[in-house]
Amino acid sequence: MAEKKKVEREFVEASTGKTSKGPAVVTAANKKSATGKRVAAVILWVLALAAEVGAILMLNGIWYIKEEQKMYWLIGALVIDLILVIIGSQLWKKANRLDPASKQSSVKFFLWNNMGLIASVICFLPIVILLLANKDLDGKTKKIVTVVAAIALVLASLFSIDFNPVSAEELADAQQAVGTGTVYWTRFGKSYHLDPNCHTLMRSSKVYRGTIEEAFEANRTDPCDFCALEQE
């Protein structure tokens, strides 16, 4: 049986992007970072709502646009709306991994982890309903813009849903297990590792390392089963 070729690995600091050959401990101001991301997300969602309002004003004729240009303006507003909603939702999800809500408050936990989805519905569902009810647009424009708006609603919702929400209790458990130590993860892996020499990491040429908070921010919220077993 051929011997597996040993991969030369480099370790990358998650906070700085710098590389080195040995382990290190990195601290992160996760609370401050999460607050900044949430503020930015809300600002982007407000701008997205403004784009939707602009589309509604164009649709109702309050903001005058020539009929032959109206379809392009409406689609442009919807695209801007979509981009802003998705970017805001990604920032909100990252903030939730840094500073997650507690499951003890089920209402807050639900709202915190579905805020992006709520923003998506608010920023697209009204315009979809108004398009369907509108009788002034020509048939072609109405059909195309309605389809674009519906697709945008679906895309925004899919990108905004957090399919793996993290609770404050899960983060606390991870912090207790790891302490102030360093955890490791790879670009395409789903877990964080407690041991830089875990056999599941040995074939990765680039290994990221950082605090448990940085691992959660990178959406690596599940501990490696092999590392956990070895640590017991």
Residue ranges and their predicted role:
Residues 158-232:
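Mature, structured domains enriched in cysteine- and short glycine motifs
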Residues 57-58, 89-93, 160:
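Juxtamembrane cytosolic interface motif at the C-terminal end of transmembrane helices
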Residues 1-86:
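Membrane-anchoring hydrophobic segments
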Residues 71-74, 96-117:
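Loop-to-transmembrane helix junctions at the membrane interface
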